[in-house]
Amino acid sequence: MAVVLPFESPNPASLNRLVELVAPDMERVNATILARTGSEVAMIPEVANHLITSGGKRLRPMLTLAMARLAGYSGDGHIKLAAAVEFMHTATLLHDDVVDESGMRRGKVAARMLWGNEASVLVGDFLLGQAFKMMVEVANLHALEILSSAAAVIAEGEVMQLGTAKNTATNEDEYLSVIRAKTAELFAAACEVGPALAAKEKAELAACRSFGMNLGIAFQLIDDALDYGGKSAKLGKNVGDDFREGKITLPVVLSFRRGTESERKFWNRTLGDADIRDGDLDQALSLMAKHHAIEDTVGRARHYGAIATDALALVPPSDIKSALEEAVAFCIGRAH
């Protein structure tokens, strides 16, 4: 059974305007990424580049570049910080795939399947080391504080997710706490470091951080909806991976809490006890459809997307502001 995501029409938004506006800086970021994955240890660039060159949108570093431009920053530090943000993101993906025992990432075989769990973890650690090295080279204490704090929060989020895995009693607030830490924190930091380099006032920094935080929450909500309603070829992973891995995401939280006693027993067996049988994924999709769990997840994503857009309301109109607003619309309207 397929769940149809509640988008009124094909996604009209795109990242094209943002991509075009930051293209010159992004070329420099990509060159930095390529240079910093280099190592005399041959396995390091092999593992790192397997994921880095696999077609990710580079959204987080683009946000760093765009926000630096929005803040009027005229130096070069944002290039290394954008590369550091991408390395932090890539490291979390390498680590996540080990924790989740994932077989696919971005439509390719996960690095852990080719080089093993140990190599994936250690190369992730290498990328984090390179990220911190670039932060230090930029020599801006505030930017270093923002990104290093984010690294700690992200790790906390990963541990928090371990605590909610297979726990069907997880409530919506607990779920949101996990995704704020695990996903949205890096979006927030990516959006804050550019204005920090430009020495903007606290109110402006807070607005940029709010934009990133709420965009990150919306982004993860859509990812969680797509895991049950998307298509494998476009998702870059198998539909239902979250179900098979026992992850308690918002579609599950809503379905469990709105369900009957027998339906809750189903969730306790499949996710709580990891006893998944043939036909259980279809049953899960059926229950989500019955309780409008997918469409309500998307509705919440729209809510957080609106908060992100409103965060920049006092910023004067510009091409870069319009591109950031369109990026929000794209992230929410991803019709995979």
Predicted regions mapped to residue ranges:
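All-alpha prenyltransferase/terpene-synthase fold signal
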Residues: M1-H336
